[in-house]
A protein has these predicted regions:
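A beta-strand edge to alpha-helix "cap/lid" segment located at domain peripheries
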Residues: 1, 54-131
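Short, low-complexity N-terminal intrinsically disordered segments enriched in polar/charged residues
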Residues: 1-24, 126-131
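Short, mixed-charge, low-aromatic patches
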Residues: 4-14, 37-40, 55-59, 80-82
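Hydrophobic pocket/interface hotspot
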Residues: 6-9, 20-21, 25, 29, ...
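Short glycine/serine/threonine-biased micro-segments
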Residues: 14, 33, 89
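Flexible, active-site-adjacent loop/turn segments at secondary-structure boundaries
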Residues: 20, 37, 41, 92, ...
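A solvent-exposed, acidic/Ser-Thr-rich amphipathic alpha-helical stretch
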Residues: 26-75
Length: 131
């Protein structure tokens, strides 16, 4: 795995295109979103983890718009620092820094742990309730 390849995997998330990103995620991925907010949890499949992006899409019309700020890659692991620069339905600027630690099998993400600003994510959903 190379830094350029990891950057390319995340590139589509800048415009909210999660489908291109999820093409690089294993069907049986093991992904934990850390924290105490509505997206936190342990997801044991691509479909389950993709649900977090679906949920975000209901309150962030243009998607999370995640931009890679820094990354470290060693062998089949990567640490990716991202920043969401999205705007919520109610106009809230969702400027959320996050870090994701990944494990790859070849070019496929098989494990992930994401750390987000729990207070900001909670505020996002409190101010933009999903019906």
């Amino acid at each position: 795995m190379t830094p350029d390849h990891v950057r390319q995997i995340f590139k589509s998330l800048e415009t909210g295109d999660s489908a291109a990103f999820f093409a690089h995620v294993a069907d049986d991925v093991d992904w934990t979103v850390m924290g105490t907010h509505p997206l936190a949890g342990h997801y044991r499949s691509k479909a389950a983890y993709a649900g977090t992006f679906t949920k975000l899409g209901k309150v962030l019309p243009q998607g999370a718009q995640l931009h890679v700020e820094h990354l470290l890659v060693k062998d089949d692991e990567a640490a990716v620092e991202l920043r969401s620069l999205a705007t919520a339905i109610n106009g809230l600027r969702f400027d959320n820094p996050c870090c994701t630690v990944l494990a790859f099998d070849g070019e496929t993400i098989v494990r992930g742990r994401s750390y987000l600003d729990s207070a900001l994510v909670a505020r996002l959903f409190e101010e933009n309730p999903i019906a």
